[in-house]
């Protein structure tokens, strides 16, 4: 355990073909992360702060946003949101999660990131479970696609993921459309007893790099 606690901070800055980032994640002291789209310069992904509380409470109490996501259960009070933000602000190395908020024109309108990070027991590969939620008014505008691409690409290229997994329920037609048609990845049927997910997309680092959605593919 001591070796894990003494891991050096994960610090990097960079610019790719479609986003820039400043990453400083540390077990000790405050962490920071900001990813800015070059396609939409007013679109940013960053770690949450206390100032996001009202926006997140609004997001998690709007049925249109959470109807297909059981992981949002119980996030319906100011106290629950405050606890969630504090949880998301804590960064442990090795990484266990990197949750972000989506900011457009200075307004917090969504959340996402890698909600769980861990090593697969069979081969030791580092896996990140990715997700994204946007307010209804900001959907079908390209923001969801661009935000998810930034989360995935940053996860592989900066955070060191070997695979990124994304899951949803069968009824979530909009998200299935994003994954199947827009991104073009193949899903597998699953039975997720915890969150009820029925489809999963398992994306390897190599497959992502070769896709037209990655920084490499857009270069």
Enumerate the language-model features and the residues they cover.
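Short, intrinsically disordered/low-complexity patches at protein termini
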Residues: 79-80, 89-92, 199-200
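Conserved GNAT-fold acetyl-CoA-binding loop/helix
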Residues: 64-87
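A short helix-loop-beta-strand connector motif used in the catalytic cores of GNAT acetyltransferases and
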Residues: 86-101, 110
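Acyl-donor (CoA/ACP) binding surface of acyl/acetyltransferases
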Residues: 1-67, 99-219
């Amino acid at each position: 355990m001591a070796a894990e606690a003494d891991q050096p901070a994960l610090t990097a800055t960079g610019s790719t073909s479609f986003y820039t980032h400043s990453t400083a994640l540390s077990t000790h002291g405050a962490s920071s992360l900001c990813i800015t789209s070059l396609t939409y310069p007013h679109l940013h992904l960053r770690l949450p702060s206390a100032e996001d509380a009202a926006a997140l409470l609004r997001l998690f109490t709007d049925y249109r946003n959470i109807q297909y996501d059981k992981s949002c259960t119980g996030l319906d009070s100011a106290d629950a949101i405050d606890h969630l933000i504090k949880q998301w602000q804590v960064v442990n190395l090795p990484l266990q999660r990197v949750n972000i908020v989506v900011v457009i024109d200075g307004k917090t309108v969504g959340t996402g990131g890698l909600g769980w990070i861990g090593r697969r027991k069979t081969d030791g590969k580092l896996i990140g479970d990715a997700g994204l939620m946007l307010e209804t008014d900001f959907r079908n505008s390209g923001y969801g696609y661009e935000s998810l691409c930034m989360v995935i690409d940053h996860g592989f290229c900066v955070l060191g993921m070997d695979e990124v997994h994304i899951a949803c329920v069968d009824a979530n037609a909009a998200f299935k459309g994003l994954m199947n048609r827009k991104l073009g990845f193949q899903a597998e049927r699953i039975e997720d007893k915890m969150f009820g997910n029925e489809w999963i997309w398992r994306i390897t680092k190599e497959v992502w790099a070769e896709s037209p959605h990655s920084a490499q593919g857009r270069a």
